Amino acid sequence: MSTEIQKIEDNNLKESQMWNSKELKEAIKEIEKMFGKGSIMVLGQSDNLNVETFSSGSLLLDNALGIGGYPKGRIIEIYGPESSGKTTLSLHAICEIQKLGGIAAFIDAEHSLDPKYCHNLGIDTNKLLVSQPDNGEQALDILEMLINSNSIDLIIVDSVAALVPKTELEGEMSDQSIGLQARMMSKALRKLNGLIAKSNTTVIFINQLREKIGVIFGNPETTTGGKALKFFSSIRLEVRKSENILSNSEIIGNKIKIKIVKNKTAIPFKTATISLLYNKGIDKIGELVDLLVSYEIVEKSGVWYSYQNEKIGQGKTSVIQWLNADEKRTNELIQQVKKIIEQKE
C-alpha cells in the first residue's frame, strides 16, 4: 500500500514540475506573443470554451438539441425537400436573436425573401440586414466581410443550391461545370470556419436535396455543394413535412419532423416534430402544452387536463385557451420548462 502511495506522490511531483517548467512557460509566452492572447489556454480554466446558445424558436427543438438551442460561433446546416419549412425555421432563429438584442443578416441567394412573412413571424425588418448577391463567390465574400466585422450574431444563407459559381453563370448552357460549386464551397468553408469561431457568429446554411444517379442500394438522396459543409457543420438538421394540420376540415398548417443527423455539442439522432401554422410559423403555445404534459407540470387524465389539482378543461384546445388568457402565467411556465431543459443538458 505504501508503494502505491509513493508512486502517486512521485507522479504528482512530476506533474507539478512539468507545469512549472521554464521551457513550457517560455513556449506559451512565445505562442501568445506571435498569435495573440487566448491562442493557447488550459481547457478547464477557459470560459471561452463553454458553448453559448440561443433558442431556435421552438421549445421542442431546443430540447432535442440537448443544449437548449443553437450554439454560437458554429456552422449549422438545415436541409430537406422543397417546401418542408427550412426557411421558416431559420427565420425563427433570427426572431430569437433580435429578442436578445443581437444583429442578424440574411444572404438571399434565391432572391425569394418575403418581408411581410418575416413581419408575421415577429422579425423586426428594420433591423435585419439583407443581401441578394449575383453569384456564389459574391455571396461568400459578403459572408466573410460580415463575419470579420465581429458585429453580427447570426447569418442565414438561403440557399447553398443557389450559390452558383461566376464561371457557370458567365459560360454557355452547354458548358460542363462538374464540381465547380463543391470546390467553391470547400475553399470558402476552410477559410471561414476559424473566423466564425473567433467572431462567435452563428452561420446557418439552408440546403436542398438532390438524387444521385444510378444508386440501387442505400439512400439516393444527397445535399448540394459537396461534402465540405457536412464536415464543417457542428449541427445538421434534416427537415421533412409530416402531416397536415386541420381546423374544421381546412388545412391551416403542417407538422414537420426534424432529425438531428449530426450534433457535435450533444447527443445526435434525436427528433422533434413541430407544428408550422401558415403565416404564423411555429405553434409555440401548442408545443408548450406538449412539454408541460411531458414534464408533468400539467396533468392529463384521459381527455381532461389539470394544473395544480385544478381542472383546466377537456382537450388540448382548452389548455391553449387557458394559456392565452394569462400571459404572465404562460411566461412563468415557459421559464419553468426552459429550466428543466437546462438541467437535462
UniProtKB/Swiss-Prot annotation:
PROSITE patterns per the UniProt record, alphabetical: RECA_1 (PS00321), RECA_2 (PS50162), RECA_3 (PS50163)
Major location (coarse): cytoplasm
GO MF: ATP binding; ATP hydrolysis activity; ATP-dependent DNA damage sensor activity; damaged DNA binding; single-stranded DNA binding
Protein keywords: ATP-binding, Cytoplasm, DNA damage, DNA recombination, DNA repair, DNA-binding, Nucleotide-binding, SOS response
Top-level division of the source organism's lineage: Bacteria
Any one cellular-component term (Gene Ontology): cytosol
SMART domains in alphabetical order: AAA
A single GO BP: SOS response
Keyword set includes Transcription regulation: no
Protein's UniProt keywords contain Endoplasmic reticulum: no
Pfam family, any one: RecA_C
Protein localization: Cytoplasm
Covalent S-S links between cysteines: none
Entry's family note: Belongs to the RecA family.
Protein name: Protein RecA
Lineage: Bacteria, Bacillati, Mycoplasmatota, Mollicutes, Mycoplasmataceae
